[in-house]
Amino acid sequence: MSAKYIFVTGGVVSSLGKGLAAASIGCLLEMRGLKVNMQKFDPYLNVDPGTMSPFQHGEVFVTDDGAETDLDLGHYERYTHSKLTRENNWTTGRIYEQIITKERRGDYLGKTVQVIPHVTNEIKAAMKRAAVDVDVAIVEIGGTVGDIESLPFIEAIRQMRQELGRDNTLFVHLTLVPYIAAAGELKTKPTQHSVKELLSIGIQPDILLCRTDRFLSKDIKGKIALFCNVEDEAVITAKDVASIYEVPLGFHHEGVDRLVMKYLRLDAKEPDLTRWQDIVHRVYNPKDEVIIGIIGKYVEYEDSYKSLKEALVHGSLAHNLKLNVTWIEAEGLETKDESYYEQLRHVDGILVPGGFGKRGIAGMLNGIRFAREHKVPYFGICLGMQTASIEFARNVCGLEDANSSEFDPATPHRVIYKLRELRGVEELGGTMRLGAWACKLEPGSHAAKAYGTTEISERHRHRYEFNQEYREQMAAAGLKFTGTTPDGTYIEIVELDQNEHPYFLGCQFHPEFKSKPLEPHPLFKAFIGASYEHRMKRTHTKEREEESVFLRPERVGK
């Protein structure tokens, strides 16, 4: 059977949550036993988001095959079992790159290359390649309906309906129904105008997901259905929720998956939502909390660390804990402002995530030193592993000017330097060590205990590595190199001796990209466990101190 397509579009405003909506639909269909694949088309002209600022685009999600993609692919992988590749994320820039390459080769045989049919055909071909050996392909169109940039993609999905028919294509439109407090009522006009915009392009939506902060009444749903030409049951309340893991359950309650089955004429079992219900139950019924301090360069824009935050949530839920994140600006730890160090004193674990450039590095080193000297559980990822190595070289090995050649090309001690195969390469786009690489772990290490094996594969995104000329000296001082590539070329994991520090681990790869709510990543689960143990020790120590103050001789008899 050929795959059926669900096309997800958005209207009124951006950032309504199309990615989460698409992922939640995919999740529900998988629970019904269907095989699903997910795809995202972004209307910007960049070939990929790899060189875009985290402040503009947010996180860059890396797939096993090394593609640098939109953060929505992270939602897709966390909510479904789809194994995504570069075929699952396309941009206008990449589509045009393909077309121009073909034109230069002469593939178009001298024809005038135009948006229709050449651009739309390229888009449709990409959609069809991602729909092989699956029951349903869910395609999200980025941007907002009405934007000039999105028009070729909207036209392409209109043509897909013409080619494949109504039984094989479904249009899901996410829109906004705002509540106007002054008037005391929900307003449907933005939704009506958004659908009108879609209709003007030739698309009649089949299902409307109405983003709102309260449940839509039967009358409101009826009004939207009447003016937007959809069935009453196809007007769905996409209500704001406190936890994103509620979204699939909310959609199921509203009958979204049932409607998909009906419109696409699919036959499948009822979904088993037990495990998702358990996750949501844990979210709202934790036994305790854990506080993690994240020392980062982009902390004012949390989407820069989307997968990281979710992986910490997954690790916390595995221990039935509520996660509280303290975002610590790395540059703040370079100042004499005591409030930043006060933040460090109140966290149960410290994490330094990935990043690029010199800004904030000194603050990260100060935070890492605090974690090492005060025995606070530490987890360094990518840049966090590199800075941990630099801090150790400086403050334990006595290599005062130790640094990375990225931050100081003239440093006498290049503890971190550019990947050997990238020396002389000046282009930034797609030139890093990307994608899944094998790693061998040392038995008995924190990492090996967490994974339960000594052979793993993790995703990478970096252009600098640990300089093995310093390995022997730093190992003698107490730094353990517990993870390497199978051939020993690259250092992948460093740790402190477990007798010297309860939990101190840095990894060159990005484990957050493989964590899921139902399958928390072992390293995040271990880090949260160590952080909570540290919290318990701190609490007991504080209680003993308070008790000793209360029982001092001068207080007795008062």
Curated annotation (Swiss-Prot):
GO terms for molecular function: ATP binding; CTP synthase activity; glutaminase activity; identical protein binding; metal ion binding. It is an enzyme of class 6 (ligase). The active site is at C382, H510, E512. Residues 1-266 are annotated as: Amidoligase domain. Residues 539-558 are annotated as: Disordered. Gene3D superfamilies: 3.40.50.880, P-loop containing nucleotide triphosphate hydrolases. One of its GO terms (cellular component) is cytosol. Pathway: Pyrimidine metabolism; CTP biosynthesis via de novo pathway; CTP from UDP: step 2/2. It comes from the Bacteria. Homotetramer. Catalyzes the ATP-dependent amination of UTP to CTP with either L-glutamine or ammonia as the source of nitrogen. Regulates intracellular CTP levels through interactions with the four ribonucleotide triphosphates. NCBIfam families: PRK05380.1 (NF003792), PyrG (TIGR00337). CTPSs have evolved a hybrid strategy for distinguishing between UTP and CTP. The overlapping regions of the product feedback inhibitory and substrate sites recognize a common feature in both compounds, the triphosphate moiety. To differentiate isosteric substrate and product pyrimidine rings, an additional pocket far from the expected kinase/ligase catalytic site, specifically recognizes the cytosine and ribose portions of the product inhibitor. This is CTP synthase. It comes from Koribacter versatilis (strain Ellin345).
